[in-house]
Amino acid sequence: MNVCTFTLVLALVGSVSGQYYDYDAPLFMYGELSPNCAPECNCPHSYPTAMYCDDLKLKSVPMVPPGIKYLYLRNNQIDHIDEKAFENVTDLQWLILDHNLLENSKIKGKVFSKLKQLKKLHINYNNLTESVGPLPKSLQDLQLANNKISKLGSFDGLVNLTFIYLQHNQLKEEAVSASLKGLKSLEYLDLSFNQMSKLPAGLPTSLLTLYLDNNKITNIPDEYFNRFTGLQYLRLSHNELADSGVPGNSFNISSLLELDLSYNKLKSIPTVNENLENYYLEVNKLEKFDVKSFCKILGPLSYSKIKHLRLDGNPLTQSSLPPDMYECLRVANEITVN
């Protein structure tokens, strides 16, 4: 099947995607090493509160001297954390432990909750089977992706927690529903690549970004997303959604800017709000284009704000698109169709 892209105005240069959050190391120039540093690690003199211990084949957390606020321990062989590992640095703010061998049973006591200034805790790519805890109230960013997590502990009292990354785990909807409902500051939640067959109940209504792609979700409860009055980015691609499992106004959310429903089993285009800008519907079973899915009425001031629309990989063809589509989607930059 040949796929062609036709442009209504001008094709945007660059890719279109949702909101991703990139937390790189603090920016600085490497220079003379600080004397306040573990001998096997790197503490640049120009940024003396950061200690880099990446790629050293460490089997345990090294001695961390007082004054360190940003600690990087990526790509090692650390398989345990003693309860006293961070006693000298109770004002630690970032703790990055990605790509190690950590298991829950070998993370001792209240090693994290003692860090009263901790804002970022990253333990991606380890061997965790449940979430870690207890955690300090100061925590803003928790990343536990690419583990084997099937159980979430309590997140009670984490009033500042804003970002949670749980993709590529073994979570089912029951585990999620029981743990996250009290997080009133949560804005970003990634639950993609898990084992959910239903949408989890009780997710925080404060969410701006919600990723649920690559699960086994078959239906959406009526008015499920209406509670999320600020939701902007929603991904449900690579699930098992069919028309019978999607109530008529499931995605008619005025705040929504991007919706990804690609790689499902939809035969008709779900109705969306006129404020939506990016809509991904490729590789479904769409047979017709209904303008009313985008525009309830047409007029000089009534039109869709869609900029990018993907319809390729469906039975729908360019020749079957209705003429009034162009009036409804008048500000679109790019529409991709077979």
From Swiss-Prot:
GO molecular function: collagen binding
Residues modified as Pyrrolidone carboxylic acid: Q19
Protein name in UniProt: Lumican
Modification after translation, per record: Contains keratan sulfate.
SUPFAM superfamilies linked: L domain-like
Quaternary structure and partners: Binds to laminin.
Compartment(s): Secreted, Extracellular space, Extracellular matrix
Keyword Zinc assigned: no
Modified residues (Phosphoserine): S304
Ranges for domain LRRNT: 28-66
Keywords linked to the UniProt accession: Disulfide bond, Extracellular matrix, Glycoprotein, Leucine-rich repeat, Phosphoprotein, Proteoglycan, Pyrrolidone carboxylic acid, Repeat, Secreted, Signal, Sulfation
LRR repeats: 67-88, 91-114, 117-137, 138-159, 160-181, 185-205, 206-227, 230-250, 255-276, 277-296, 305-326
Glycosites: N88, N127, N160, N252
Chief site of localization: secreted
A GO biological process held by the record: positive regulation of transcription by RNA polymerase II
Cleaved signal peptide residues: 1-18
SMART domains per UniProt: LRR_BAC, LRR_SD22, LRR_TYP, LRRNT
Disulfide topology: C295-C328
Modification type Sulfotyrosine: residues: Y20, Y21, Y23, Y30
Gene3D superfamilies: Ribonuclease Inhibitor
